[in-house]
Amino acid sequence: EEFHLDNVAGYPNCTFNVSVTYNECTDGGGITEINVGNFSLVTYVCPQYTIDLQNAINAGGIVLDNFVFGFEKKLYEAFEFHYFNLNPSTCLTGVQRNFNWYLDACKQYCITSVDIEGTNILIFNPARCGTGCCKRDTRMCKDPITGQINKTTTYYIISTANCGTILPDWGRRKCDYVTNSCTLPCPHAST
């Protein structure tokens, strides 16, 4: 399913279209689990993002790595808030939405220039470059009194990461740029 995100942190007045596979399961107690599968940026309309990404590409190395991984996290957060706000749940006893993201523990990114209706945009796609996986777990509900959204995100190591042990398979993609290192995308993960 495609979602149009206009709430990405740092990019007001921009729209990012993401393709997401997910399933939703609600238990009898009011908890809804959203298990997110494939997640990718498809297109966007955002001149500032193009400038920021090009600046990161020009700087290269750790600057590019940090930008791409940081932006991916912003997309995850924007999707969580967007999806939650389609049907918000209040923080009554046990009522909440849980977003579960199972991520490759080691990723590297291929950045490709794509022509969309005469406009050249840069899209990044991940590839595994090691073994192991981790989980991003976000729990959300809306406080019925304040109207504020209560949100906690935790990262867990599911299996130990061994980065750099697999060469990334870019498939048929032509990579204009590649992130510098094979990196663990789950910061501050705990077991």
Q: Where are the predicted features?
A:
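Short N-terminal edge-element motif at the start of the domain
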Residues: E1-T43, I51
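A eukaryote-biased signal for long
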Residues: K73-T191
